[in-house]
Amino acid sequence: MTLIAAHHLAVRRGRDEILSDVSLSVAPREIVTIVGPNGSGKSTLLRALLGILPAAAGRVSRRPGLRIGYVPQRLQVDGTLPLTAARFLSLPRRRAPAEVAAALERVGVPEVADRQLADLSGGQFQRVLLARALLTEPELLMLDEPTQGLDQPGEAAFYRLIEEVRSTTGAAILMVSHDLHVVMAASDRVICLNRHVCCEGTPRVVSNAPEYRALFGHGTQGALALYRHEHDHDHTHDHSHHA
């Protein structure tokens, strides 16, 4: 069963075609990562799937009643506003303190509840955004470059957290990666986008695809770098595609 799909989707901005003939789908519990150069339409694709941007051609289909959690690429917060993390999670819908505390605990930052958003580190703020998205109990979690601005340990830790979210909640993940050569080892599929779908498949298949190499060069021997980590639990998905 498909949760969300694009069918020959095109998106235009004025006379410019940002996306052309894009088709993709996300199944339950699947982790799909979208990579592409700057200006390739990655963020536009997420916004079109969410219904924020209209389709110039083609269409988007969603399973009826699908609950989606969204972590945007950038969220500017006025540093002069007194807004704690706990209060932020209660906007616009008021949440019980216990619910807010549980959400922050779930993403590993229970200590930031009473801290001002402006005082949080980049990694802490991204986790607060994730906590907010998870409050809707999403069946599909959409993340737009969620690790941008994080250092490598912070990036790896956030990816581990995303895997844990999928494992514990069963949510599917559709994520845009800002780093052309870094993709989660847990990704079931990688979609290479440059205004259209250049290629897609497992991380290993995409890293060896001529379309990927033509776009991004050989970089780290032309291969996508895959974050790996030791597991003390079983996943139902296959990790055998580690590079």
UniProtKB/Swiss-Prot annotation:
Transmembrane segments: none annotated. It is found in: Cell inner membrane. Residues 4-219 form the ABC transporter domain. GO terms for molecular function: ABC-type zinc transporter activity; ATP binding; ATP hydrolysis activity. SUPFAM superfamilies: P-loop containing nucleoside triphosphate hydrolases. Its EC number is 7.2.2.20. SMART domains: AAA (SM00382). Keywords: ATP-binding, Cell inner membrane, Cell membrane, Ion transport, Membrane, Nucleotide-binding, Translocase, Transport, Zinc, Zinc transport. Gene3D superfamilies: P-loop containing nucleotide triphosphate hydrolases. It is an enzyme of class 7 (translocase). ATP binds at residues 36-43. It is a peripheral membrane protein. GO terms for cellular component: plasma membrane. It catalyses: Zn(2+)(out) + ATP(in) + H2O(in) = Zn(2+)(in) + ADP(in) + phosphate(in) + H(+)(in). InterPro entries: AAA+_ATPase, ABC_transporter-like_ATP-bd, ABC_transporter-like_CS, Metal_Ion_Import_ABC, P-loop_NTPase. Signal peptide: none annotated. One of its GO terms (biological process) is response to zinc ion. Part of the ABC transporter complex ZnuABC involved in zinc import. Responsible for energy coupling to the transport system. Belongs to the ABC transporter superfamily. Zinc importer (TC 3.A.1.15.5) family. The complex is composed of two ATP-binding proteins (ZnuC), two transmembrane proteins (ZnuB) and a solute-binding protein (ZnuA). This is Zinc import ATP-binding protein ZnuC. It comes from Cereibacter sphaeroides (strain ATCC 17023 / DSM 158 / JCM 6121 / CCUG 31486 / LMG 2827 / NBRC 12203 / NCIMB 8253 / ATH 2.4.1.) (Rhodobacter sphaeroides).
